[in-house]
């Protein structure tokens, strides 16, 4: 890392002198060419020089090596010209330290090269790459503050650092870079911890590897070849520190420079020591009892967990065995079923019993009867049919279609007999024409049959069919009876039946021997897919030439359809309630309605009911 610094310094000549070290060659590698170069003059002049500066700009003094035997102190503000920094995380600021482990290692290597270029015998112990143990400084030397802590480091003017042209091992002992540059904070904190806990003498297993370096340094200063009885042996280090006396105190004060400034380090986690000094025997006894109880509880918990695991394992094994047994049984039953199925299929073509059952089928109402009915023959079906043809029951829901050959319902007696004697399902077969005579007819109400009415099956429910229909004479009289002076209008009595065709009434009146619907339904009839709607008037209405209706060829006689006089347009009003109840709707609710503009009301719902005015229903 190269830092170009233009600095104007005012130097003062002092009485302290320094030998001139060898200057570093500029052709060396950039990683090891980070040195300190300061140009000073013996007089009060100003000079501008380029050098490498590793200290922040706000420091008041710096350690410098000059070309003259004088030690200089910077008294003026330095102007820093910062160039790109290689290997640094960020640019140096007033709060960010500019010294990184890389720069510290470079400084260390630079001093090694300066002190070990010409003397290979001195540099031989450092070929392994480790730092030598710290040695004591010269007496009357000021405190050397580690550069790694990024604080001010001042070399007093009254102290001399003798650095000869031929460097030797004393340079390392005087500068003490190995202890002040690298790892000073960790060692100082551990040393302070040792000083504070020297009285207790309590050793735990939570010591880190950094504490070993402190014991190693203490043993090295004392010249001991062994590190104690163990890797983490604080006892030997503490005993060595206590036995040294004043020399050990000086060593601690010189090497661990940040002892007073560093607070006591907190111990980490881990178990507490087995024996505490501030515990009473009662507390120790309580602790021992509590630990015994905890151990017993933990043992019981482990035993219970093991027992539960064993029980579950045994249960799982039993269930697995049971599952295997069931699978084997299922396999055996499946094979047996396949064998029986094969035997039945092989025996079916040659079985005479099955052939007789198929040929001698006893049917009743288009259904295949069970085998139990074979003994009774067709008489049972005939008796059942005869009984049901004269009784009114709920057999209408069990109606079936004979022509299609499908089963839509079962007779109660037949169904119960089939369930009790026939284990096989009843299947539909093709019905022969000879079996149509045995089909049960759907009975109608006795009242309707006695009156010989011709109501269609698609009419209202049977409860409303019990009311007899009016005759042709009654209907004609009601149509021709006038209800007001304006003329004849429709005056049909209210009935709760469906409207009947006039043509059917006329035909039935002329031919009393005409067959009814029950007689017409004797033969087979296919179920219709659509609903047949018949017009109420068989013949079309005849209109006069003027289109007004009511008069044909200038005559005043009304139009007659099948003998029923009809006026066109009709002056009657169809009753909506009668239509909804299943009636004809021909009963007028009031006199004839003559629509005009004055009688129309835009809000018919606001009319009071009943009213004397003509009804506001729209005429058809």
UniProtKB/Swiss-Prot annotation:
Residue segments, region Leucine-zipper: 312-340
Chief location: nucleus
Top-level division of the source organism's lineage: Eukaryota
Gene: kay
Subunit: Homodimer. Heterodimer with Jra. The kay-Jra heterodimer binds more stably to the AP-1 site than either of the two proteins alone.
Region (Disordered): 1-36, 184-288, 375-414, 447-466, 590-620
Pfam families per UniProt: bZIP_1
UniProt entry tagged with the keyword DNA-binding: yes
Protein known as: Transcription factor kayak
GO terms assigned for molecular function: DNA binding; DNA-binding transcription factor activity, RNA polymerase II-specific; RNA polymerase II cis-regulatory region sequence-specific DNA binding
Signal peptide (UniProt feature, chain positions): none
SUPFAM superfamilies: Leucine zipper domain
Biased composition (Low complexity): 201-233, 249-266, 377-405
Family designation: Belongs to the bZIP family. Fos subfamily.
The entry's keywords: Activator, DNA-binding, Nucleus, Phosphoprotein, Transcription, Transcription regulation
Lineage: Eukaryota, Metazoa, Ecdysozoa, Arthropoda, Hexapoda
């Amino acid at each position: 890392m190269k830092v170009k610094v233009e600095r104007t310094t005012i130097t003062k000549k002092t009485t302290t002198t320094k030998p001139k070290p060898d200057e570093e060659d500029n052709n060396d590698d950039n990683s090891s060419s980070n040195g300190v170069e300061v140009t000073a003059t013996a007089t009060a002049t100003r000079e501008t020089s380029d050098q490498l500066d590793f200290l922040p700009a706000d420091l008041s003094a710096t350690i410098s090596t000059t070309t003259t035997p004088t030690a200089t102190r910077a008294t003026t503000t330095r102007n820093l010209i910062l160039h790109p920094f290689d290997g640094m995380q960020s640019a140096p600021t007033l709060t960010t330290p500019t010294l990184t482990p890389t720069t510290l290692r470079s400084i260390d290597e630079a001093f090694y090269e300066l002190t070990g270029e010409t003397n290979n015998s001195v540099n031989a112990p450092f070929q392994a790459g480790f730092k030598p143990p710290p040695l004591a400084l010269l007496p009357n030397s000021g405190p050397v503050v580690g550069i790694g802590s990024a604080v001010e480091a001042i070399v007093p003017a009254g102290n001399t650092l003798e650095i000869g042209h031929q460097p030797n091992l004393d340079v390392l002992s005087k500068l003490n870079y190995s202890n002040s540059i690298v790892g000073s904070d960790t060692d100082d904190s551990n040393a302070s911890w040792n000083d504070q806990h020297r009285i207790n003498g309590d050793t735990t297993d939570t010591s880190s590897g950094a504490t070993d370096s402190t014991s190693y340094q203490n043993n090295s200063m004392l010249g001991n070849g062994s590190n104690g009885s163990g890797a983490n042996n604080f006892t030997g280090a503490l005993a060595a520190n206590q036995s040294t006396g004043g020399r050990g105190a000086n060593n601690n004060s010189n090497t661990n420079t940040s002892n007073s400034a560093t607070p006591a380090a907190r111990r980490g986690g881990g178990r507490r020591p087995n024996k505490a000094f501030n515990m009473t025997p009662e507390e120790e006894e309580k602790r021992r009892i509590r630990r015994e109880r905890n151990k017993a509880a933990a043992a019981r918990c482990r035993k219970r967990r093991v027992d539960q695991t064993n029980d579950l394992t045994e249960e799982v094994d039993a269930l697995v065995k049971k599952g295997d047994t069931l699978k084997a049984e299922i396999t055996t039953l499946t094979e047996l079923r396949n064998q029986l199925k094969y035997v039945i299929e092989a025996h079916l073509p040659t079985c005479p019993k099955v052939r007789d059952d198929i040929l001698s089928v006893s049917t009743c109402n288009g259904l295949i009867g069970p085998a139990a009915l074979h003994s009774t023959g067709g008489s049972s079906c005939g008796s059942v049919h005869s009984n049901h043809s004269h009784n009114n029951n709920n057999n209408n829901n069990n109606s079936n279609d004979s022509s299609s050959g499908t089963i839509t319902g079962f007779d109660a007696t037949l169904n119960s007999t089939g369930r009790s004697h026939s284990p096989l399902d009843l299947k539909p077969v093709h019905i022969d024409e000879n079996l149509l005579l045995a089909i049960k007819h759907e009975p109608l109400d006795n009242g309707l049959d006695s009156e010989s009415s011709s109501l269609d099956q698609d009419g209202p429910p049977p409860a409303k069919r019990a009311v007899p229909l009016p005759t042709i004479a009654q209907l004609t009289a009601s149509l021709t009876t006038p209800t007001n002076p304006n003329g004849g209008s429709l005056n049909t009595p209210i009935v709760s039946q469906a409207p009947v065709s006039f043509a059917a009434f006329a035909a039935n009146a002329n031919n009393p021997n005409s067959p009814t619907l029950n007689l017409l339904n004797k033969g087979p009839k296919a179920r219709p897919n659509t609903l047949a709607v018949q017009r109420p008037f068989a013949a079309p209405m005849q209109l006069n030439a003027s289109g007004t209706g009511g008069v044909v060829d200038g005559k005043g006689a009304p139009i007659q359809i099948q003998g029923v006089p009809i006026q066109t347009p009709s002056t009657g009003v169809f009753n909506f309630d009668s239509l909804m109840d299943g009636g004809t709707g021909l009963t007028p609710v009031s006199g004839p309605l003559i629509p005009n503009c004055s009688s129309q009301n835009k809000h018919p719902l606001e009319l009071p009911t009943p009213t004397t005015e003509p009804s506001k229903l729209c005429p058809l």
